[in-house]
Amino acid sequence: MKLLYTDIRHSLTKVLVAEAESLVAAGKRVFYIAPNSLSFEKERSVLECLKTQASFAITVTRFAQMARYFVLNDVRQGQSLDDIGLGMLIYRTLTELDDGELKVYSRIKKDPQFIQQLMDLYHELQTAQMSFADLEFLEEPEKREDLVKIFTAVTAALNKGDFDSSSQIAAFAQHILAGDTDEELADLALVIDGFTRFSAEEEYLVGLLHRKGVEIVIGTYASQKAYRAAFREGNLYQASVDFLRKLAEDYQVKPDYIPHAEAEDAFGRISKILESRYDFSESTVSLSESDRSQLQIWATMNQKEELEYVAKSIRQRVHEGVRYKDIRLLLGDVEAYQLQLKTIFDQYQIPYYLGRSESMAQHPLVQFVESLERLKRYNFQLEDLLNLLKTGLYGDLTQEELDHFEQYLRFADIKGAGKLAKDFTANSQGKFDLDCLNHIRRRVMTPLQDFFKSRSQTASGLLAKFTEFVQAARLSDNLTALLQGESQQEQERHEEVWKAFSHVLEQFAQVFADSKVKLDDFLALVLSGMLLSNYRTVPATVDVVKVQSYDLIEPLAAPYVYAIGLTQERFPKIAQNKSLLSDEDRARLNDATDSQAELQIASSENLKKNRYTALSLMNSATKELVLSAPALVNEVEDSMSTYLLELTAAPLSLPIIVKKPQASSDDIGSYRALLSQIIELHQEEIDREWTAEEQTFWAVAVRVLRKKLAAEGISIPHISKELKTETLQSETLQALYPQEQPLRLSASALNEYFRHQYAYFLKYVLRLQEEWTIHPDARSHGIFLHRIFEKVLQDDSSADFDRRLAQAMEETSREAEFESIYSESGQTRFARQLLLDTARATGRVLAHPSGIETIGEETGFGSASTPFLTLENGRAVTVSGKVDRIDRLTKTESLGVVDYKSGDIKFSFEKFFNGLNSQLPTYLAAIEELADYQEDKGTFGAMYLQMTDPIVALKDTKTLADAVSQSMKPLQYKGLFVADAVKELGPLYEKNKTNLLSQEDLDLLLAYNAYLYKKAAEGILSGHFAVNPYTENGRSIAPYVEQFKAITGFEANLHLGQARQLEKLDASKFDRRPTGDKLRQAWLEKMREEMEK
């Protein structure tokens, strides 16, 4: 055995390749061993260092792969199980154990994460050269008994099923011990590169090979100073020196230091200064400004900016002649950066390769399996069924059929297998074609129902049922259709997923064989196997930027290296133990077992491993290195790593470069990046004055960009400060509003028009509707209460009011229309109870009419024969609607209108003037059309009655009488009243002076109401509908006013100037704010002025 070490700025690979070539010259077959994470990259490095550029006698590989070469042709006694099969076997073993047999893990024995932890521990014990019997040394008795029992059962299941899940290294070691490979080992040599520790299994294999006379060369990085130091704790090279010293002691070999003749560079000098700092020795090394320029420390605001600066720098280097393959990007947190990395590098057109396995979880086939599993587990929840259909792999539904089916399922809130098994019957005014929908339902549900009827049966029987199901679901045909038009790369990915799917089913058949399995367990196991599957990751070309986690880097990896995301939380990485064995358990097992057996204790390795990783990172570049840390990662604040801050302290004294957006030509990376940069700079303020040269540069850059976009046929969408709408053409207007027919309006349509013209266009012209639902909403609640009061008031029996009310509530609740929607669930039954409480409370008002008689309920008004008004061009306008209740004063026979409201609504002159509150005036005008109306008797008012169950805070009352009085206040009639009739009205009517009208006032009010309808009608017939939501305060738009932002694109910060400002009283005309009569008169005068314009 030969042990070598060299300085970190001297290529160890070159040294070891030279050793390998000399071994080949001596007739040896050389295995060049690298760690798992570096083997692919190391193969390229070795080829670059070979004098002949290639060699059939040198194989670059990993320990496990090397072992596979020697056992590949073995006739293995058992069937081979991979991790998917092993996980299934563990699952099967745990289900066969009774709950009472496990004291600690009984409740989680089917949990996928627990099974994964057991599988990890299984492999870890193999790697550590320990047997399951060694778990007897655990201190906690219950945990010890459970783990021993589980692994004993797993071992028995492996033996019974003739399965083999042993590692390749263990199998190779058995051959070495048996002497089966002595002839092959005679010409074997090992060169081991990149290790600072061996696992117990690797160490055992190296020992066996050494004893068989195999020549072994092991190399690592270390300084002579560190190796000779008596005290190594805290040294940067502690990990590699401890590794060397242990090997030297075990094999009685003195490590050889390999000097190098190259001149020391900036990174070498920085490394020596850092080494002296950590071993508390004096350093005479100094840095020049040229040295400091080769290592930069960046500080950025967030990871997006950080990636953009890196991308711009890469493009600049490529412009200067650097190849992408000469650039390495290291990430402090791959998960946090992965999505934005793709977005920004695609924007800057930088090819890259992220050497990380990609899960198949988002593939439609995996989602198909997941939806099946969830449908069975959760009994056909709506979203699970829709997800299955939307994979495109189930059935033969067209997109139109799927849309209609989904719309109905959401309307009727179909959940559960019971509802889906029955024909659909719920409908809304015949809007759904139930025959067509039930035909779709049968096509969807028949294969699922047949498959889910499967009870516990053997694995072979279950797989046969599953095969029938996927054939009925046309899975194969749908997958074939999915491949149409796809690129070669995408087709290969689909093929990988299908192979993984087939492999999971094969492993299931192999593991469970004749065992009985429940359908739920089968689907869960197949899903688990699919989620464990990953795509192969191979770079498409050689000339790409390689991206990897910083802790996988080795010295001298690339000429230019960018390491980003180096915050305190991520650099250094603190390995955490998440296994079933705690650090204390591991230490106890290590002490109790053979010296060759050892479980890794992450916490004890953290410090020296992280120091060595930091040193490797500092020496990863051969020319220039950039270390960067953002202030925010995933919107969470973090600080710069202490390793980076150490570089800023004397004598290194490296400056921290704070990166900010600047209008610099250095920031240009590509046309896409230029476009992004111009938009970003346009939206943000520039923090310095531009020079004339910079202004000229950016002016030219914008012109070039515009020409490029024009050549590509690309236009830049922009947010205009003015939203314009197209006027409807005359043909369209004629189709919508024929000349020979009157224009039909209503109080709610008028309100919508003056609230926002374009909203009127969407609702009343295009007739857009909200998504239908079978569940009761505000509209159905209102109809329910209206029906109760209608029945009460129409009941002429001599029974007292409370009895009549109770009977009306009972009859209304039993009506088919309401029984179907208010009896469906506990939630709807609770809503009905609240409505009945409201009816009882509001009924107290109806019980005391006090000189009032009701002569009509739900009375309609407005017809083509009697137009509401006629426009100047002779066009008739009708206003239609329905009045909830018409009352008559028994003494004067004047009429009044009552409108039931669920909210506390009051008449406002300001809103009425602006067209936003015309309901009551419209009702007053409508009374004059009624047969019961007598002009000489007139009207006494129009009012709202709030349907509510009042709540009174007792802390605001002094006596019980006060509480009763307070509870009746919300239950008053509130609205407009004719002053002469007020004396006939009781205490249930709110007599606000502002709303008491003389006959002259009433006539003016009705005239202005007609003026509003005329103004709206002329605007509607013109065919122009502006985007002009109203604003009350001139600063913002209420959400209920602008509900169509996604359609109109209205943004308050850009388009507030288009909003309609509400007209208000001129405060300068009054000494103080008017109230009562003065307020009414002021608004009436303003109406008169408006109509006279």
From Swiss-Prot:
InterPro entries hit by this protein: ADDB_N, DNA_helicase_suRexB, P-loop_NTPase, PDDEXK_AddAB-type, Restrct_endonuc-II-like
> Which Gene Ontology terms cover its molecular function?
5'-3' exonuclease activity; ATP binding; double-stranded DNA binding; helicase activity; hydrolase activity, acting on acid anhydrides
The record's SUPFAM superfamilies line, in alphabetical order, gives: P-loop containing nucleoside triphosphate hydrolases, Restriction endonuclease-like
The record's EC number reads 3.1.-.-
**Which cofactors does this protein require?**
Mg(2+)
Return one Gene Ontology term, BP aspect. Answer: double-strand break repair via homologous recombination
Q: What else does UniProt say about it?
A: Despite having helicase-like domains, this subunit does not have helicase activity.
Q: How does it assemble?
A: Heterodimer of AddA and RexB.
Q: This chain belongs to which protein, by name?
A: ATP-dependent helicase/deoxyribonuclease subunit B
Report the source organism. Streptococcus sanguinis (strain SK36)
Taxonomic lineage is:
Bacteria, Bacillati, Bacillota, Bacilli, Lactobacillales
